[in-house]
């Protein structure tokens, strides 16, 4: 870049490359690791960190009172995410660790081990290859604020913390029916989760310390400690109610651990709204443009502007409009390229609607480098679309727009003179809907990370869903 040439304009490909390859997050993670470990020679340390390629592996802590189901949820998450499960019991059973041997003796005597020894065990275990490569889930650790602070001091930072919660009366009752499979460690319940196989039923054992009094004492100790542990994990902690079916708890936990936290990475929204005619794309685009100062790029409007301005492309487009034919994709993309290449689109971002209508247009859009970083499908039932569009009317005298159901004219005189736009005729709408439905499956497959929104609700509710999808990072895809 020539220092004498001002102002500098950064090519749009540069921030797009950084965003697609998560360059900012990569640099942020390396800086965090440098500050935590403070190596004497940073360069080899950073190279080693890059070789590990484990910035996005699961690092999860699951906490909760006795009988909340945290071990079950942790085991299910481990199977789904292919991560390593760390519990107090399996940490002390590590046969290849002298620290674990010492901790095991203390654990057999007292059923607890000192915090310093526990944290040392965790540190040793997390350094092993399976935890480094595949990530880890801590079940029920840390139990106290002292343990939480010791873990943080060593630079062990979870990405997600889940706290299960349920009324004490429910937990006490649930704990009485708890049973354990001694071979697999799986936890069952006499009422809620009884195994169908008679072989497993016969070998189930009643765990120790599950009486009502003992459970109440454990709950009292848990409540005393958890209020001091929670402040150690601001912004990464989610409380989930355990007073619901275990499968529901699991899916809420899985959804949370697959989410990404917001970062300070530069982000220029490039939003694509897809959906059938009448799904509300234009309204949502206008709301986004108004609130976030995005450039509202409507494909149909661009074509009309090109004709009105009598540009070269406008003259080529005009015959298609006169004959009511679809504009050639090549012409369409040239008009669109001119608009998206302007500085306001590059600097502020854009919200595009009206294109692509099919897979060919989508591939053309991508080949030109206009890759959206947020794609939304607005789903609206066929009957709702017909109701929205076929009942629209316009007053030829005042130009006022009406809807026979949602915004009827105030007088019979006005009603009598209302006209319907030919494009809102039932047959025309059905043709457009049929075309949209035929192409939607291909577009959904192409835009795999797209977010589907129910468009058949209040427009501002729809806007809130779209807004949330733009502001928050996209969830991780677990293979």
Curated annotation (Swiss-Prot):
Residue numbers binding AMP 1: 140-143, 147, 203
Reactions catalysed: AMP + ATP = 2 ADP; a 2'-deoxyribonucleoside 5'-diphosphate + ATP = a 2'-deoxyribonucleoside 5'-triphosphate + ADP; a ribonucleoside 5'-diphosphate + ATP = a ribonucleoside 5'-triphosphate + ADP
Region described as LID 1: 177-206
Annotated spans, LID 2: 391-424
Keywords: ATP-binding, Cell projection, Cytoplasm, Cytoskeleton, Kinase, Nucleotide-binding, Transferase
Region (Adenylate kinase 1): 58-258
MF terms in GO: (d)CMP kinase activity; adenylate kinase activity; ATP binding; nucleoside diphosphate kinase activity
Binding site for ATP 2: 278-283, 392
Function in brief: Nucleoside monophosphate (NMP) kinase that catalyzes the reversible transfer of the terminal phosphate group between nucleoside triphosphates and monophosphates. Has highest activity toward AMP, and weaker activity toward dAMP, CMP and dCMP. Also displays broad nucleoside diphosphate kinase activity.
UniProt similarity note: Belongs to the adenylate kinase family.
Name under which the protein is recorded: Adenylate kinase 8
Organism name: Macaca fascicularis
Species classification: Eukaryota, Metazoa, Chordata, Craniata, Vertebrata
């Amino acid at each position: 870049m020539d220092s004498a040439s001002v102002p500098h304009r950064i090519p749009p490909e540069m921030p797009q490359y950084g965003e697609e390859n998560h360059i900012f997050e990569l640099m942020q993670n390396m800086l965090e690791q440098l500050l935590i470990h403070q190596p004497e020679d940073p360069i080899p340390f950073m190279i080693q960190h890059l070789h590990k390629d484990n910035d996005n592996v699961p690092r999860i802590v699951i906490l909760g009172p006795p009988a909340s189901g945290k071990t079950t949820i942790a085991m299910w998450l481990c199977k789904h995410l292919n991560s390593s499960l760390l519990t107090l019991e399996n940490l002390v059973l590590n046969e290849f660790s002298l620290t674990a041997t010492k901790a095991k003796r203390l654990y057999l005597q007292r059923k607890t081990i000192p915090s310093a020894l526990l944290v040392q065990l965790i540190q040793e275990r997390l350094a092993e290859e399976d935890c480094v490569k595949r990530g880890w889930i801590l079940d029920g650790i840390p139990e106290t604020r002292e343990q939480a602070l010791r873990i943080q001091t060593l630079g062990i930072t979870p990405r997600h913390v889940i706290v299960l919660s349920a009324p004490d009366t429910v937990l006490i009752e649930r704990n009485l029916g708890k049973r354990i499979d001694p071979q697999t460690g799986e936890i069952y319940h006499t009422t809620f989760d009884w195994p169908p196989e008679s072989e497993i039923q016969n070998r189930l054992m009643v765990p120790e310390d599950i009486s009502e009094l003992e459970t109440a004492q454990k709950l009292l100790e848990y409540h005393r400690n958890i209020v001091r542990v929670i402040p150690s994990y601001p912004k990464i902690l989610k409380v989930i109610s355990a007073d619901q079916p275990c499968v529901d708890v699991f899916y809420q936990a899985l959804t949370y651990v697959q989410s990404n936290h917001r970062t300070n990475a530069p982000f220029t929204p490039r939003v694509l709204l897809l959906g059938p005619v009448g799904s509300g794309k234009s309204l949502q685009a206008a709301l986004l443009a108004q609130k976030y100062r995005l450039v509202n790029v409507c494909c149909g409007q661009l074509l009309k502007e090109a004709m009105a301005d009598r540009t070269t492309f406008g003259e080529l487009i005009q015959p298609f409009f006169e004959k009511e034919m679809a504009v050639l994709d090549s012409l369409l993309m040239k008009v669109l390229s001119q608009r998206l290449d302007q500085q306001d689109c590059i600097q502020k971002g854009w919200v595009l609607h009206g294109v692509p209508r099919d897979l060919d247009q989508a591939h053309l859009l991508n080949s030109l480098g206009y890759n959206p970083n947020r794609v939304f499908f607005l789903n609206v039932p066929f009957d709702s679309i017909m109701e929205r569009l076929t009942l629209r009317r316009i007053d030829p005298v005042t130009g006022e727009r009406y809807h026979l159901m949602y915004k009827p004219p105030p007088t019979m005189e006005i009603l009598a003179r209302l006209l319907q736009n030919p494009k809102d005729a039932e047959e025309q709408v059905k043709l457009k809907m049929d075309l949209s439905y035929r192409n939607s499956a291909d577009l959904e497959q192409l835009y795999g990370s797209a977010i589907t929104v129910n468009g058949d609700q209040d427009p501002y509710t729809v806007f809130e869903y779209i807004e949330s999808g733009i502001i928050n990072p996209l969830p991780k895809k677990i293979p």
